[in-house]
Swiss-Prot record:
Native organism: Bacillus pumilus (strain SAFR-032)
Coiled-coil parts of chain: none
Recorded name of the encoding gene: rplL
Keyword terms of this UniProt record: Ribonucleoprotein, Ribosomal protein
InterPro entries associated with the record: Ribosomal_bL12, Ribosomal_bL12_C, Ribosomal_bL12_C/ClpS-like, Ribosomal_bL12_oligo, Ribosomal_bL12_oligo_N_sf
Gene3D superfamilies tied to this protein: 3.30.1390.10, Single helix bin (1.20.5.710)
Superkingdom classification of source: Bacteria
Family the UniProt entry places it in: Belongs to the bacterial ribosomal protein bL12 family.
Gene Ontology CC, one term: cytosolic large ribosomal subunit
Pfam entry (one): Ribosomal_L12_N
Protein name: Large ribosomal subunit protein bL12
GO molecular function terms attached to this record: mRNA binding; structural constituent of ribosome
PANTHER family: 39S RIBOSOMAL PROTEIN L12, LARGE RIBOSOMAL SUBUNIT PROTEIN BL12M
Single biological process term from Gene Ontology: translation
Amino acid sequence: MALNIEEIIASVKEATVLELNDLVKAIEEEFGVTAAAPVAVAAAGGAAAEEKTDFDLVLAGAGDQKIKVIKVVREITGLGLKEAKELVDNTPKPLKEGIAKEEAEELKAKLEEVGASVEVK
């Protein structure tokens, strides 16, 4: 049974960040492509490096207060209890990708407040 475009878009809208990440990986493997954007070669003189604007929030460890960390992870990602627990149990894992620096720092502080170790990349 074939899905129409609207059904596919609706499914993508309802998916979590982790589910979308898995989808991208599956598409890359199935079709032998990569989701990475092509990189432009810099001129010999070299332009000034652009300041990074998109950051990834990575949960490196849960610490001693795992239940509190799971609650904050659920709040940040919108995941269900089971998915959030699996994410916390299998660190390091990305929580949010391509977010602004301010949001990344705010979420990092919130997670560190409950004892998690977090990296902003």
